[in-house]
Amino acid sequence: MVFLSGNASDSSNCTQPPAPVNIPKAILLGVILGVLILFGVPGNILVILSVACHRHLHSVTHYYIVNLAVADLLLTSTVLPFSAIFEILGYWAFGRVFCNIWAAVDVLCCTASIMSLCIISIDRYIGVSYPLRYPTIVTQRRGLRALLCLWALSLVISIGPLFGWRQPAPQDETICQINEDPSYVLFSALGSFYVPLAIILVMYCRVYVVAKRESRGLTSGLKTDKSDSEQVTLRIHRKNAPLGGSGVASSKNKTHFSVRLLKFSREKKAAKTLGIVVGCFVLCWLPFFLVMPIGSFFPDFKPSETVFKIVFWLGYLNSCINPIIYPCSSQEFKKAFQNVLKIQCLRRKQSSKHALGYTLHPPSQAVEGQHKDMVRIPVGSRETFYKISKTDGVCEWKFFSSMPRGSARITVPKDQSACTTARVRSKSFLQVCCCVGPSTPNPGENHQVPTIKIHTISLSENGEEV
């Protein structure tokens, strides 16, 4: 939000000559604010590129995170530089018209950033509460509508002062005031902060309650399963095994339970990461939105200029630290950031044009730093994919659930050794995959997605060896 010089409310109607610049103070402020801006601009660009360059991050949740990064990028690139110049010089040097436009863009970006966190909290609540139904509830079309409404509301809140909803501006154009009209301050504080904050807190309280309940239920379900449920095992059998009626029902129940546990674990992890983001948001913005209404409605209790500057820049700090939070709390983003910085995502995009699918590397047959007998599963157009996070990166596998009958063909050797096993050790769990298919496709083979069945998925967060 836009800052008001401490003597602006007492300013005269004539233009005052600007005071001389304090050089040591200007250098110190320039270094501090410059570092802040240099963290914010590249950091938010890195978030956007990380999602754009990695297909496994192309989800509605990550689109919301990109929207948050876009709002923060606009703030750090178009608003903060002029705020820094204003602080260093001690007066506004860009004229009255640009002051009004700059103030409106400031409110627009800050409001959009805060409302993005609000939408993300709602998304996480749905993801944790309904992990299996989440893809049908949160679709890309609904996500796009939510983002359009977000920017429309932010625009409505920000343009009021441009149409006269403000106190009279001083004639001195070296002063750029914050809008202290009490009615607008109340409207903007409620719309930009307090209503979104209430929604965020309610959603994350619900997420906490649901996560505790689901964790308790899923843990008790694991204890009643087989004794080897302390590992995470995924077996994709080469063909559907014949089962009796009770065996089929038991297999379906176990598969449903295990898939729910896998999806719930992922949603819970994402909620933790975004919970840290929201916690930092409250710490950064709450002081400003406490000080601003108090100064507007109770001028006698208006804080000093130094206090206002601190809480003012503390709010701006929130838009600069979000890109730091992601890699520190999410292995997924950490690896994506590293790939972007190493320009690996561009190479992956070029190589993916010639690839038929994704590859699983069996470590039991791998030499140090090399992989042999790769198992390749061709990519289809109607698949549902899950992500496996490893300590050294992100591995993807695909579960094809909606392919029509007869559309997939694969040659299955009779030799049992053709079923290759791949192990992936993770920070929180171990995955063992038994996948169907030859190492290299046959020339005359139809490269469609093979019809596969998940026989057993059992989970644990201990990550013990099989």
Swiss-Prot record:
Lipid-attached positions, S-palmitoyl cysteine: C345
Cytoplasmic face residues: 52-63, 123-143, 206-272, 330-466
UniProt xrefs under SUPFAM superfamilies: Family A G protein-coupled receptor-like (SSF81321)
Entry's Gene Ontology cellular component terms: caveola; cytoplasm; nuclear membrane; nucleus; plasma membrane
Family from the record: Belongs to the G-protein coupled receptor 1 family. Adrenergic receptor subfamily. ADRA1A sub-subfamily.
Subunit structure: Homo- and heterooligomer. Heterooligomerizes with ADRA1B homooligomers in cardiac myocytes. Interacts with CAVIN4.
Compartments, as annotated in UniProt: Nucleus membrane; Cell membrane; Cytoplasm; Membrane, Caveola
Organism expressing this protein natively: Cavia porcellus
Glycosylated residues, chain numbering: N7, N13
Motif Nuclear localization signal: positions: 334-349
Major location category of this protein: nucleus
Annotated membrane topology: Multi-pass membrane protein
Keywords: Cell membrane, Cytoplasm, G-protein coupled receptor, Glycoprotein, Lipoprotein, Membrane, Nucleus, Palmitate, Receptor, Transducer, Transmembrane, Transmembrane helix
GO biological process: adenylate cyclase-activating adrenergic receptor signaling pathway; cell-cell signaling; phospholipase C-activating G protein-coupled receptor signaling pathway; positive regulation of cytosolic calcium ion concentration; positive regulation of MAPK cascade; regulation of cardiac muscle contraction; regulation of vasoconstriction
Spans traversing the lipid bilayer: 26-51, 64-89, 100-122, 144-168, 182-205, 273-297, 305-329
Highest taxon above the source species: Eukaryota
SMART domains membership: 7TM_GPCR_Srsx
Function per UniProt: This alpha-adrenergic receptor mediates its action by association with G proteins that activate a phosphatidylinositol-calcium second messenger system. Its effect is mediated by G(q) and G(11) proteins. Nuclear ADRA1A-ADRA1B heterooligomers regulate phenylephrine (PE)-stimulated ERK signaling in cardiac myocytes.
Name under which the protein is recorded: Alpha-1A adrenergic receptor
An annotated Gene Ontology molecular function: alpha1-adrenergic receptor activity
Extracellular side: 1-25, 90-99, 169-181, 298-304
